[in-house]
């Protein structure tokens, strides 16, 4: 994956990459906008709001990661470890002393770090189906999804 990001960045002369995880069906554009705004105001080597990385407080599954292409180019020269090359940001997160890492603090109403909206298992798929049955749509924002979840289940489930 790292190589794909680098090739694409070079081909299109991209300065900054916003990475959304494919197992997140409830991507929230407003939370990605919040991340981009945060990144512009707080220049760093990596920022995120897609899960509770770096103690952001976010539920897993709404946001993204953002990283300058120049950092990806540097990582390419620093590691040949298969894991680092398969998972685009693993090297950065495992080497926090080398990079300026930041996270967007979750706003009130989204501060549920134990909630997980990823789809990785059959149980995750069942949860997705239940949320759709109770009213979540492609147009639902992150606040609506969390509120519908809490109204149905009354307490956050623990992450796996």
What positions do the PLM features span?
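Short, conserved alpha-helix that lines the donor NDP-sugar binding/gating region
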Residues: 2-10
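Short beta-strand-to-loop acidic/aromatic patch adjacent to the donor-nucleotide binding site
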Residues: 9, 14-22
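Cytochrome P450 catalytic domain signature, combining two hallmark sequence patches
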Residues: 82, 135-140
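Short, acidic Gly/Pro/Ser/Thr-rich loop/turn segments
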Residues: 125-126, 135
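Short, flexible active-site recognition loops that position polar ligands and cofactors
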Residues: 115-118, 134-136
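Conserved core of the sugar-phosphate nucleotidyltransferase
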Residues: 3-4, 27-115, 126, 130, ...
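Short, conserved phosphate/pyrophosphate- and ester-handling motifs at nucleotide-, phospho-/glycolipid
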Residues: 121
